[in-house]
C-alpha cells in the first residue's frame, strides 16, 4: 500500500471468504452515431444484443446467472425495466432476478458496483451488469396542455364535448416534446456547463481541439492495430439488411486544422465548445459478466481482471457540474489503498474536451484539493502517457448508459496486453454526479 494514501480508508472489495470480484468477460455493440446504423433499434434491443453476445462469448449456462442489473438513461415508457426485458429476451432462466438503475452518464459504473456488492454480500454468485441507450429511438412526449386535454377527452360522451375541448388547443400545444437536454433543477445544459468550465479554468479552444484530435487519432490507431475488435460484436440490426462491426464515429483521417473551422455550439459569440470537441449523440450497449474469483476458477474462466474499488460523488449543479472525476477519484484511490502514481492506465470519460481538461487540471491543483476536497494536497499530476491511451468518448461516442462498461472492458484488456497493473476509470455525469473505479489485472 502506497505511503501517500490514507490507509484508514482502505476498503478491499472481497467476499466474506476473501475472494476478489472478477470481471470474467465483457462485450459491446459497435457504437453508432445518432440516426445511422441503429436508427430504428431501441435501447432494450441494443441491450439484448450485447448480453446475448456476452452469453455466447462465455458459453455460460444461463441457469447460473443469478441477477442482471442494467441501466438506460433515456427511458422507454413501454419498457421501463430494461434489465428484466433483457432476461426475457435472451433465453435466460425465467427466474433470473433483474432490476434497472440510472445514474446518467455513470450508469454502467453503478450497475457494475451493484453486482459487485451483491456478490460480496453473498446474495448472488454470478451477475451481469451493463447499460444501453438509443439517441435515435426517443420517447417523444406531448405538452402538458395536450396531455390533460387527451385525458379529458377520454371522459367525454358527446361529439360536441370533444370538439369543445379540441378548440382549446393551439398549434404550440400539439407540437411534439423531445426529451429534455437541460438539468431539471437549473435549466442549464451539459454544453453550457462545458462552456462555463472552459472559461472558469482557462481551457482554450486550441487545447480542446487538440484533445479531440488526439482522441480520434488514438482510437483510429487502436482499431487499425486490432486492439478493439475482440470486444465489439458484429450487429445485424433490424430490418437485417446491413451489419455493423465497428464504431462509426471515429475520424480515421483526423486533421487538427479542420477542427478550427467549426463554430461554437453553445455560446455562439464567445464560446469554444464545438460539435467536434464534444462527444456525439450515440446508440449502443455494453455488458459485463461478474463473479467471485473462486467461482470463476470453478467454472474454468480466466478473468479479464478485478474490481479493486469504486466511489461516487455528488456536487453542486450550478457551477463546475461536470467536475465529478476530481471528487470521486481521490475516494476511489483511498479505498484501493493506492496513489495516482501507482496507476498504469487512466481512462476518463470525455463528455467534452473542456470538461476533461478541467478535471485534468484539478487533479494536480493543491488549491482545489484544500478548498473543495479537504485534503492536504492534490492527488497529483496526470501522466498523459497513461491517459486515454486508446482514445476516449469523443471518438468512440457516448451511448449514455453503456459508456462505463465500454471503459471497463477496454481498460482491463489494455492492462492485460501490458502485462497487468492498475487502471482508473472515471466519469462525470448529469446532476453533478461523478464516478471512479479502480481496476486490477495480474
From Swiss-Prot:
Keywords: Acyltransferase, Cytoplasm, Fatty acid metabolism, Lipid degradation, Lipid metabolism, Transferase. GO terms for biological process: fatty acid beta-oxidation. Its EC number is 2.3.1.16. InterPro entries: Ac-CoA_C-AcTrfase_FadI, Thiolase, Thiolase-like, Thiolase_C, Thiolase_CS, Thiolase_N. It comes from the Bacteria. The active site is at residues 105, 398, 428. Pathway: Lipid metabolism; fatty acid beta-oxidation. The keyword ATP-binding does not apply. It is found in: Cytoplasm. Belongs to the thiolase-like superfamily. Thiolase family. Catalyzes the final step of fatty acid oxidation in which acetyl-CoA is released and the CoA ester of a fatty acid two carbons shorter is formed. PANTHER family: ACETYL-COA ACETYLTRANSFERASE, CYTOSOLIC, ACETYL-COA C-ACYLTRANSFERASE. Heterotetramer of two alpha chains (FadJ) and two beta chains (FadI). NCBIfam families: AcCoA-C-Actrans, FadI, PRK08963.1. This is 3-ketoacyl-CoA thiolase. The gene is fadI.
Amino acid at each position: 500500500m502506497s505511503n501517500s494514501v490514507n490507509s484508514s480508508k482502505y476498503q478491499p472489495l472481497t467476499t466474506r471468504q476473501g475472494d476478489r470480484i472478477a470481471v470474467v468477460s465483457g462485450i459491446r455493440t459497435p457504437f453508432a452515431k445518432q440516426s445511422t446504423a441503429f436508427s430504428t433499434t431501441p435501447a432494450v434491443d441494443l441491450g439484448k444484443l450485447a448480453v446475448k453476445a456476452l452469453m455466447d462469448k462465455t458459453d455460460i449456462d444461463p441457469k447460473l446467472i443469478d441477477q442482471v442489473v442494467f441501466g438506460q438513461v433515456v427511458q422507454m415508457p413501454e419498457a421501463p425495466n430494461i434489465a428484466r426485458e433483457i432476461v426475457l429476451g435472451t433465453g435466460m432462466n425465467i427466474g433470473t432476478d433483474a432490476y434497472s438503475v440510472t445514474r446518467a452518464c455513470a450508469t454502467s459504473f453503478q450497475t457494475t458496483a451493484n453486482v459487485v456488492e451483491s456478490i460480496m454480500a453473498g446474495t448472488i454468485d454470478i451477475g451481469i451488469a451493463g447499460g444501453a441507450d438509443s439517441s435515435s429511438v426517443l420517447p417523444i412526449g406531448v405538452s402538458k396542455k395536450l396531455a390533460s386535454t387527451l385525458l379529458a377527452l377520454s371522459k367525454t360522451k358527446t361529439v360536441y364535448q370533444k370538439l369543445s375541448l379540441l378548440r382549446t388547443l393551439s398549434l404550440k400545444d400539439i407540437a411534439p416534446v423531445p426529451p429534455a437536454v437541460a438539468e431539471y433543477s437549473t435549466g442549464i445544459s451539459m454544453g453550457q456547463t462545458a462552456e462555463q468550465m472552459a472559461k472558469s479554468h482557462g481551457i482554450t479552444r486550441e487545447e480542446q481541439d487538440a484533445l479531440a484530435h488526439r482522441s480520434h487519432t488514438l482510437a483510429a490507431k487502436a482499431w487499425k492495430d486490432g486492439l478493439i475488435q475482440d470486444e465489439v460484436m458484429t450487429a445485424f440490426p433490424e430490418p437485417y439488411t446491413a451489419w455493423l462491426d465497428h464504431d462509426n464515429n471515429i475520424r480515421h483521417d483526423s486533421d487538427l486544422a479542420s477542427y478550427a473551422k467549426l463554430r461554437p455550439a453553445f455560446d455562439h459569440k464567445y464560446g469554444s465548445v464545438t460539435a467536434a470537441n464534444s462527444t456525439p449523440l450515440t446508440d449502443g450497449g455494453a455488458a459485463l459478466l461478474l463473479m467471485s474469483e473462486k467461482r470463476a476458477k470453478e467454472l474454468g474462466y480466466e478473468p479479464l481482471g478485478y474490481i479493486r474499488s469504486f466511489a461516487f460523488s455528488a456536487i453542486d449543479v450550478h457551477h463546475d457540474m461536470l467536475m465529478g472525476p476530481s471528487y470521486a477519484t481521490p475516494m476511489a484511490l483511498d479505498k484501493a489503498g493506492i496513489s495516482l502514481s501507482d496507476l498504469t492506465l487512466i481512462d476518463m470519460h470525455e463528455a467534452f474536451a473542456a470538461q476533461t481538461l478541467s478535471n485534468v487540471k484539478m487533479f494536480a491543483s493543491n488549491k482545489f484539493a484544500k478548498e473543495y476536497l479537504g485534503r492536504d494536497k492534490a492527488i497529483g499530476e496526470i501522466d498523459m502517457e497513461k491517459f486515454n491511451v486508446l482514445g476516449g468518448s469523443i471518438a468512440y461516442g457516448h451511448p449514455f448508459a453503456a459508456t462505463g462498461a465500454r471503459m471497463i472492458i477496454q481498460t482491463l484488456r489494455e492492462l492485460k496486453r501490458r502485462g497487468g497493473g492498475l487502471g482508473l476509470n472515471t466519469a462525470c455525469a448529469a446532476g453533478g454526479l461523478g464516478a471512479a473505479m479502480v481496476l486490477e489485472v495480474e
